[in-house]
């Protein structure tokens, strides 16, 4: 391992020990905000520190085994130990490289999830409903909270469009690679001939930004319309114009919110989604510039980004970005998404490592 990387790891290990000491200090415990910030930092440094300690121990084992090679009686055992220690050292170095990769500051944030029915009419709306249920199950398993912000139901079930806020630890980091096109191949319930139809939905995942980081939106750039909400919401839901539609004139982005009975609450929710969408559009522009030189696994939420195909007759799901095919569609639709999410995160990390080695 390069001396510069070892020096960086030593500094992080020292900081980990320093933070551990601070967390036991009475003054720190009394200051709740500082205590929380240090607890987060401690958790972030723990894996690096533990892995680096293991690596240091293995270097000592290698040194000891090399010294034993000079002893004829110990040579054979020393050679075995040396081979094992070198293999372990390589594994730990790879782990440390991944742990040192630059973190996306948005990864720990809550996220807005949008699922939109694309081509395929009623069947696309039904599939949008299935996708939303799949993500809700995944969120439930991870103890995340799902709050529907806006929903437009399909005529025969499912959703033409649904927007939800998902809150919890590391939501955006886990879900961000879901953005893009999702295609389904199956026999619709309305199909009497048993023919397989292909429909599509688009998914967009955007980080929820704190107020201080939301893009500056000029009120003059907004057109705000009110209308009577439709759908679920109790007996009083249709009696007032509580639903809100906000159009951002410079970008043409439109956000509707009709989930709350209060117009004020709907407006606040719609503005937070609008801010996230504008931020996501700006991010997509930057990513397009980067993608011209390097492939980008992070979809734009556009239909042309084909992420996955869900083939029901064959029980197959394929992720086209990394050529991964699994015959476990039933489990995936029940929210067991880690088998698809983990490989793409690993592929993304491999791309980051390749980019770093090119820079060096």
Curated annotation (Swiss-Prot):
Annotated region described as Disordered, given as residue ranges: 284-313
PTM sites of type N5-methylglutamine: 235
InterPro entries according to UniProt: PCRF, Pep_chain_release_fac_I, Pep_chain_release_fac_I_sf, Prokaryotic/Mito_RF, RF-1
PANTHER family the record matches: LD18447P
Organism whose genome encodes this protein: Escherichia coli (strain K12)
Domain of life: Bacteria
Matches recorded under NCBIfam families: prfA, PRK00591.1
Xref: PROSITE patterns: RF_PROK_I (PS00745)
A GO term from the CC aspect: cytosol
This protein's UniProt keywords: Cytoplasm, Methylation, Protein biosynthesis
Role: Peptide chain release factor 1 directs the termination of translation in response to the peptide chain termination codons UAG and UAA.
Single GO biological process annotation from the record: translational termination
Family to which the UniProt record says this protein belongs: Belongs to the prokaryotic/mitochondrial release factor family.
Membrane spanning stretches: none
Gene Ontology MF term list: ribosome binding; translation release factor activity, codon specific
Name of protein: Peptide chain release factor RF1
Localization of this protein: Cytoplasm
PTM section of the record: Methylated by PrmC. Methylation increases the termination efficiency of RF1.
